């Protein structure tokens, strides 16, 4: 899938495929985390591994108001326990398929929102 919107000062998503993501002239293997000014590959492999400790390491680098989690070709959702844990950070969390997650990330980034994307 190709995306065209791009801002030189942020990590805009250019394209994404089954194993990688291209952002502003960089390529990352999935799974990865992308925010306005930071991007890194992560060791987490599935939704069940997401918790407070994992989120703390991500948002410490670049504060965000919303975390979008791309869960693959079909949407999967956090457990109620995970939702409660993550709500303690005061960050909104949305889970959706990767295509929707990438589109939403670029849209919110264009609106100057503090958004992060975790692509599994």
Question: Where are the predicted features?
Answer:
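Short active-site-adjacent helix-start/loop capping segments
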Residues: 42, 75-78, 103-104
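Beta-hairpin (beta-strand-turn-beta-strand) motif
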Residues: 71-74, 98-99, 120
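Non-catalytic interface/targeting segments
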Residues: 1-52, 110-119
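A short, acidic, amphipathic alpha-helical segment used as a generic capping/interface helix at domain edges
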Residues: 50-60
């Amino acid at each position: 899938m190709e995306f065209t919107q791009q801002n030189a000062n942020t990590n805009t998503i250019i394209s994404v495929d089954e194993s990688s993501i291209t952002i502003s002239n960089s390529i990352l293997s999935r799974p990865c985390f992308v925010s306005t000014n930071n991007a890194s590959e992560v060791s987490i492999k599935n939704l069940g591994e997401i918790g407070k400790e994992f989120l703390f390491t991500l948002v410490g680098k670049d504060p965000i108001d919303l975390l979008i989690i791309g869960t693959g070709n079909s949407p999967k959702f956090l457990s109620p326990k995970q939702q409660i844990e993550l709500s303690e950070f005061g960050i909104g969390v949305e889970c959706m398929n990767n295509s929707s997650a990438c589109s939403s990330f670029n849209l919110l980034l264009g609106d100057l929102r503090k958004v992060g994307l975790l692509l599994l």
